[in-house]
Structure formats: structure tokens, C-alpha cells
């Protein structure tokens, strides 16, 4: 496991937007340095209320952010030109996370571009693998075969984009869903249809101390996914 407080950025031109939401207080005051048994119990905990985490990530011991479901409006601001691209940031409970991601691909159209992201090799840093012009139905069929990897590997992320328009859906290594779109309504309807409520004060797990997890099997499966997609 490795600790991180950085947002995932599967595509170069679309980093996860930053929220101005006021921080929430942790549910408990916890000591700064837990003993081994207490830390093991914390890492084994996969559910907070009704929110189910996947194996990919855990909140830090201090619970800076308590995981919960919902989505918020946000925006990516181009640091060079100052232009704004509307965004949605969603935290989805594990039992419906993958199907929600797949549903969000529908508004992207019949053909998509794909960026896979890997942080498996710490020495190599963040690596990206791209595929342009894949049929969305073919992409979806392949992704269903790798559901376990994309849900449970804390070192894998994917971004799916419209080849011409500013439309992008990210499923990042924090297992958050991020949508970039000039018109958010079609994607927002999908999120509401999945039972998610809008809360613009929502803080997500990547905004606090957290830990990612991966293993050799996931790394091998990531390579298989890149091969199936024809990424380079």
C-alpha cells in the first residue's frame, strides 16, 4: 500500500477539478499513530454507513473524509487561458460503481478514444496508454471482462473521450467518476437514475489522506487490458 493525497489525472488535458467545499469534521477523534492491530482493523473496514468501498482504496486513519455517495458540480479551469469546462464529480458505492461508469459512456457516442493510466511501477511514475477510434460497444464488451481490475486495483485508471467534442468520462484510481462536458444534463440524469443525490459540498476520498492497494495479478491484468484494447 502507498499513501497519496493527489487526484488521478488519466488524461493530460483534464485533471480532476478542485472543490472549494468546506472540510467536514472527522466522525471520531483518533490518535495519530495507531498500533498494528488497530490499523489492520481500519484497513479491513470496507463499509461506511451504506457506502461500500472497493479493495482499491481506503481512507486514512484520521478519516479526513468519510466516504459517502453523491455527486457535485465542479469545473476544470485552464491555468493558461482561464477557460472553464463544466464537470461532475461522483462517489458511488461499490455495488453499483461499475454499472454507473458504463452507463455514463452512452452519451459519448458510437466511437471513443481511450486513455489507460498505470501507477504500478513507482520508479517509472504515472504511465499512459492510448487507443483512438474504438467502437463504444466493443470497448464496453472488453471493459466488462476487466470489471474486477477496474474496481479493485488502486493503480489503474481509465478515461473515455469523444474523439472530437469536449466530452470525457474518467474512472480514476481512487474509484471516483469524473465527467467533463459543456452540457452536464445527460450525465447528471444518469447519476440521478443510479440513486445519487447532488451535494456541491461533497468531499471525496482523494481530498483527504488515503491509501491505494494493488498487487502483481492486477498489474498483469492491466497489461492484458491494454493489449485487448490495442493501446500504445
Model-derived features with residue positions:
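Structured alpha/beta or helical-core interaction and ligand-binding surfaces enriched in interleaved
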Residues: 2-176, 180-232
Amino acid at each position: 500500500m502507498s499513501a497519496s493525497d493527489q487526484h488521478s489525472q488519466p488524461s493530460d488535458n483534464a485533471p480532476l477539478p478542485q472543490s472549494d467545499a468546506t472540510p467536514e469534521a472527522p466522525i471520531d477523534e483518533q490518535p495519530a499513530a495507531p498500533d498494528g492491530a488497530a490499523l489492520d482493523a481500519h484497513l479491513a473496514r470496507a463499509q461506511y454507513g451504506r457506502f461500500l468501498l472497493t479493495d482499491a482504496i481506503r481512507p486514512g486513519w484520521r478519516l479526513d473524509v468519510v466516504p459517502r455517495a453523491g455527486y457535485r458540480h465542479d469545473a476544470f479551469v485552464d491555468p493558461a487561458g482561464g477557460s472553464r469546462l463544466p464537470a461532475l464529480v461522483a462517489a458511488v458505492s461499490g455495488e453499483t460503481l461499475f454499472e454507473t461508469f458504463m452507463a455514463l459512456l452512452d452519451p459519448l457516442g458510437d466511437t471513443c478514444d481511450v486513455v489507460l493510466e498505470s501507477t504500478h511501477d513507482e520508479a517509472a511514475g504515472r504511465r499512459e496508454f492510448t487507443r483512438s477510434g474504438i467502437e463504444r460497444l466493443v470497448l464496453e464488451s472488453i471493459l466488462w471482462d476487466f470489471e474486477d481490475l477496474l474496481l479493485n486495483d488502486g493503480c489503474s485508471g481509465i478515461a473515455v473521450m469523444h474523439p472530437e467534442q469536449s466530452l470525457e468520462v474518467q474512472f480514476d484510481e481512487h474509484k471516483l467518476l469524473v465527467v467533463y462536458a459543456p452540457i452536464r444534463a445527460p450525465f447528471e440524469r444518469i447519476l440521478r437514475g443510479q440513486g445519487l443525490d447532488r451535494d456541491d459540498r461533497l468531499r471525496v476520498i482523494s481530498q483527504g489522506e488515503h491509501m491505494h492497494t494493488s498487487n502483481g495479478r492486477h498489474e498483469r491484468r492491466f497489461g492484458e487490458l491494454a493489449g485487448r484494447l490495442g493501446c500504445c
